[in-house]
């Protein structure tokens, strides 16, 4: 059943035949209703695809309390952050979703550019200390001198919260001290955020080697 909100001239909300109507921000959205299907009607590739999407969804839920979610909400605008996360990261998951390619995975996204020639590597053989360098391009586009360098750590298959390094884009380098145990560090994701945290960049992964 559909409801007319605001009288006969108002938007429709609900189900009209096989069409679902709803409001998203200032936009009125119409989409086809999904038809129920029996369990045995799915092909093998469809079953795998559903498992893959389910795994992406589970990964997204694991970031529920992680500050990095703010980057997806900011970039997605009116749409749910998960929709953009799924579109961006589906290719990083294996066919059945059981494996993740860390180099293809993105934990942060947004309009801010990453600086040119961003590099990061373990410093002095200690996997808990990294050195990052980049070129200062704060005179171009949205980039600003006070954009903050952020890091997420992958340790033993687990992802840390989004952490501040204390470094700014204008510094052109940073020494990053990671939490946790050295032997479990698989790599780090580096990204930038504006000073007021209203804009973020997509991140880049660096393996510990």
Name what the model sees in each region:
Residues 75-209:
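Charged linear interaction tracts used for macromolecular binding and regulation
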Residues 1-115:
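Long, polar/Ser/Thr-enriched low-complexity segments
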């Amino acid at each position: 059943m559909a409801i007319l909100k605001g009288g006969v001239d108002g938007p429709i909300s609900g189900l009209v035949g096989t069409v679902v109507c709803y409001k998203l921000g200032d936009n009125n959205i119409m989409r086809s209703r999904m038809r129920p299907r029996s369990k045995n009607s799915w092909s093998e590739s469809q079953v795998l695809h559903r498992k893959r999407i389910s795994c992406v969804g589970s990964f997204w839920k694991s970031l529920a309390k992680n500050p990095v979610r703010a980057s997806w909400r900011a970039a997605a605008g009116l749409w749910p952050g998960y929709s953009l996360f799924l579109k961006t990261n589906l290719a990083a998951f294996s066919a059945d979703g059981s494996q993740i390619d860390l180099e293809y995975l993105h934990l942060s996204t947004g309009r801010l550019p990453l600086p040119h020639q961003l590099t990061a590597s373990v410093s002095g053989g200690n996997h808990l200390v990294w050195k990052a360098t980049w070129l200062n391009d704060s005179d171009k586009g949205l980039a600003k001198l006070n954009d903050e360098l952020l890091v997420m750590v992958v340790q033993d298959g687990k992802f840390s919260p989004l952490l501040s390094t204390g470094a700014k884009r204008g510094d052109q380098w940073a020494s990053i001290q990671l939490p946790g145990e050295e032997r479990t560090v698989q790599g780090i994701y580096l990204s930038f955020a504006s000073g007021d945290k209203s804009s973020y960049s997509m991140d880049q992964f660096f393996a510990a080697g």
